[in-house]
Amino acid sequence: MNDFLVFSEEVAQAKAEKKPIVALESTIISHGMPYPENVQTAKDVERIIRDRGAVPATIAIFNEKIKIGLTEGELEQLGTSHDVEKVSRRDLPYVVAMKKHGATTVAGTMICAEMAGIRVFATGGIGGVHRGAEQTMDISADLQELARTNVAVVCAGAKSILDLGLTLEYLETHGVPVIGYQTDVLPAFYSRTSPFRVDYRLDSAKEIAQFLETKWKLGLNGGVVIANPVPKEEELEESYITAIIEQALKEAEKQHITGKSVTPFLLDRVKTLTGGKSLQANIALVKNNAALAADLARELS
């Protein structure tokens, strides 16, 4: 057993009883949404997973330990503190060794989930290749993690502030399958559609579970992107959100915002420019992904 892992009572019991478990990231709480919506969404997502017969395991770093499953107090702390680090692969040893509090990104959560023996993870959207990456080389560590870590990631596609075409090219190069759940095209986070096709369409959690079992039994390491479109009633029109993202990107460039700060800045500007509609879509798609992830975890267990 990894000395750095600490399981909540609920998750430890689920592991002992071989119950289905769904990993959840924590940067969505610390950096992805404003308070109090962030903490409320985290609680709602955990409830949805429980209601569908699985056990939620929100992951974060506290006091030199990787916590697999958080208390309500810890969720609150992540949602209100201003000194929580974003933790991806490179940051994990620093945050643990220096006894800092950390919220795990998609990549960070995948690493910790695999350490904990959890194979299904629900999030909002994965990171990817940023627009203008030909010059900046700004490519999310999430993509490398998907190529090497055996965790299935249920998401609403890549965040639409990214270059979706190049993100798909990168995933293809690294052998990461992109499955569309009941869709032939890649959802673009806030929108159900984009100009890009997924690799394979599968229409049930059972089919996706069969795909995953086969991939890993073949000894093919790496994750899978399971792209689940935002619910129709909450989606934002593709052309509408694209124009707003373009404006936010120009503002980020003008203000010389780079690196880790780009995504939180863009999400915040998009929220303001849509009058809060993007936040509502974000909350809806995270809940939708949690439901599918719970169904998938049940099929795999």
Swiss-Prot record:
Its cofactor is Mn(2+). It is an enzyme of class 4 (lyase). Signal peptide: none annotated. GO terms for cellular component: cytoplasm. InterPro entries: Indigdn_synthA-like, PsuG. GO terms for biological process: nucleobase catabolic process. It comes from the Bacteria. Mn(2+) binds at D138. Keywords: Glycosidase, Hydrolase, Lyase, Manganese, Metal-binding. The keyword S-adenosyl-L-methionine does not apply. It catalyses: D-ribose 5-phosphate + uracil = psi-UMP + H2O. Binds 1 Mn(2+) ion per subunit. Substrate binds at K86, V106, S140, A141, D142. Its EC number is 4.2.1.70. Belongs to the pseudouridine-5'-phosphate glycosidase family. Catalyzes the reversible cleavage of pseudouridine 5'-phosphate (PsiMP) to ribose 5-phosphate and uracil. Functions biologically in the cleavage direction, as part of a pseudouridine degradation pathway. Homotrimer. This is Pseudouridine-5'-phosphate glycosidase. It comes from Geobacillus kaustophilus (strain HTA426). The lineage of its organism: Bacteria, Bacillati, Bacillota, Bacilli, Bacillales. The gene is psuG.
